Amino acid sequence: MEGVAMQDQSQQQQQQQQQLVPPQPVAVERLNQAVVQQLNLEAVKTRAISLFKAISRILEDFDAYARTNTTPKWQDILGQYSMVNLELFNIVDEIRKVSKAFVVHPKNVNAENATILPVMLSSKLLPEMEIDDNSKREQLLLGMQNLPIPSQIEKLKSRIDMIGAACESAEKVLADTRKAYCFGTRQGPQILPTLDKGQALKIQEQENLLRAAVNSGEGLRLPGDQRQMTPALPMHLVDLLPVGDGVHTFSDASGMYMKNTPPLSSNSIGNQGNLLQASGAQLIGRSAASPSAATSATSFDNTTASPVPYANSPRSGTNMMNTPSPQQQQQQQQQQQQQQQQQRQKMMQLPHQQQLLAQQQFRQSQMQGLGQNQMSQLHDLQGQQKFQQLHGQHQMQFSQPMGHQQFQGRQLASGHVQHGIGQSQLGQGNQLNRHLSQFSGAANSALFNAAQGTSNSQMIPNMSATVSSQSLLPRMQFGLAGNNPQRSHASQMLSDQMFNMGASNPGSMMPIQQQQQQQQQQHNTQGAFGNMQPNAQNLQSNMVALQNAQQNHPNFAQQRQQNQQ
Amino acid sequence: MECVVQGIIETQHVEALEILLQGICGVQRDRLRVHEICLKNNPNLGNVASEVRLLCDLEQPEPTWTVKHLGGAMRGAGAEQISVLVRTMVESKVSKNALRLFNALGYKLDHELLRVGFAFHFQRGAQITVTVSSVNKMLKLHATDEAVPVTPGIQLVEVTAPASSENYTEVASAVSSFCEYLAPLLHLSKPGVSTGVVPTAAAAAVSLMSDGGGTTLFSPHTTRIKTAGLAWSI
């Protein structure tokens, strides 16, 4: 059937060509118009052309896939195949209609088709086909050839019926399974099962939660108050993390300090810087403890009763080295001193390491407490000074509170505090120093102190006195190394405090608190700060020139001379 | 560098996915139980905060620690055309002191999670790792024994493959072609792009779980054919 159809198709095409090609006066053989309409040859032609195009498109796609070596999208290709299939069916239908009207194309026998016509007309099968046919027939009629023909026919009919029934049941089973598995029909578009809207939304929500949790940790962060270490740590963490009892800050700190001395001490330095931001809970938990320590010991400073802050200073009458914490103290704040003494006694009772730790904590608290204590004393200063310029400098995290502290200067910045923030604030402090030195007034002493550039040498004795931990010391030295080379000796420091400001590196980091200490020292012991007053105006005018050290130099020189008494 | 895609699957279909993966990958699955601790440092000096992850494999007899840093993803027009996410990744085994070390360096705990599930490691154009896990969070710090799933009904599927800057395109195409095999059950996409669940997941899961889908294997080859044949003989 197919072969005939194709033949007919080719014959029709030939016919059409014959119709189209010779426009000459030769009588063109045309089909009867009625027949043409009936046959709808145009439609067949269109279908044939579209089929041809579809197949060629598929071939092109495959060619492209082969060339670019990409994996083909099988879904698309299968779709295209199904389209081709459909078109073929349609064409075959059409041809069937056409072939009813025409049986053979060459109507007349002439020289051209004399040889081929018999072959076309013969109905005898080709030899291979014949053999095939025979074998199939034998297979079919096996055991039935003896019977008379009608019975053979009946048997064949029953066989056909049985096969038909089997096919139908198979189809049924397939259809049922397809329904059960929601596969959709074989032909036609697949009906995908859609999710219920509400369910889809819920799933979408959950998915967003999950993805956020995995990729960015949303929803997994415990708030600070819930970050209590569970007492029963899992096996793999048991040795690694310190388990604090979390009852008292001191005991916590001490316990943790004992266990993890090196990381703790170095952590403390970093923490001091972070404390002002009230950094979140750490695994060690010290920083969680220190704010509470801050509140409990408001202006605590681990100083001795001696007003002299510097250990190695020849001008200081008292030897600071007799206590582990050479914190400095203000005479003006007796209350604070008392508190400090009390706490110092407390500290004395604790083991040494714990003292250091507590000191560190208190220092940190002090930094936070400084603002409260010193605001009252330095109102005028604050009015005079331009904080904004300070902020323009090194943007340290604690630039703002440090600004306060600089101008307040009262509460001593203990050496511990200094080195806590020293490394990160040195440059800032330096800049500030220049300006602060030019302020006047008794209250300016703190400013002056803050403004003074301090060097390593001053810090280091304090540090060595206060902190026995090795890790701190080298760190501080490194941090301040770039500073004033003149500041090799503490005594020099005191005398050169004013000068130091001018000469110090703009980029170096100076601990501001220490500077405050120095200034306070001078104020307390020497009373040499009266000379600042005349320079107050200059300082204000010079505040703009933050970076310009030279402007400050004349002032410094004057002050230096005055300071050196 | 690594190429990574993520997808989600409902917990009820996880077993079917396991069967499918077993058929495709041809390897045995490995159990997965990883405690992931994400540490962030506070930028003290104006630097950018950096993040590092410590992974503790709790499935081994001795917990083994790995430190991993995930960098930024590749950007640009080329990156948008690739269907996987290519990002820098550095990973190394470390001793158990890593946590202390990072704390000393100033890294603080940002968040932690526990992944429980299974993983397949195999080679198919690239060294691909598929992990299917439920992501659990801990209500108390470090309480891995009391972890609860973040999303009980949904598990995370992650397909990763290490890559280098020279061969990441091949690795990306290997990963994406592997992902096409999983299409009946789930869609995978770049992390951060949500996909939703696949509507054919239920049907595919049923067919995978049925006996015709291939039993767990003694011969990976035949099972692969069986499973593959059924999964998309639609």
Residues covered by each model-derived region:
Chain B
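Polyanion/phosphate-binding surface patch
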Residues: 1-98, 130-141, 152-162
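Activation on folded, globular domain regions of eukaryotic proteins
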Residues: 2-7, 92, 108-110, 131, ...
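Conserved short hydrophobic interaction patches
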Residues: 20-27, 101-105, 174-185
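Short secondary-structure junctions
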Residues: 22-34, 106-112, 188-192
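Phosphate/anion-contacting hairpin/loop surfaces
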Residues: 35, 95-149
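Short proline/glycine- and acidic-rich turn/helix-capping motifs at secondary-structure junctions
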Residues: 35-43, 116-120, 192-202
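Mixed-charge, glycine-accented linear interaction segment located at domain edges/termini
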Residues: 160-196
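Short, highly charged C-terminal tails/helix-capping segments
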Residues: 188-234
